[in-house]
Amino acid sequence: LAIPLPDVVTAELFAAIVQGEINGDAGYQKWADNETDEEVVRLLRLNGREETIHAGRAQKVFELLSAS
């Protein structure tokens, strides 16, 4: 699946990417809250935590690029 990407990623767009990762965690947690299968719940919560980890890495990239 080809997804068109912008030629330039602005600071504003990058901040939105970080926020999207954080929101992704909340979405997975809410989804998990509504499931009854323990393995499904575990996997959804794990995916959510990974979204927060992604957000932290993306934030670090933003900080490094902003410092230069």
Where are these regions (language model features)?
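Non-heme di-metal
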Residues: 1-68
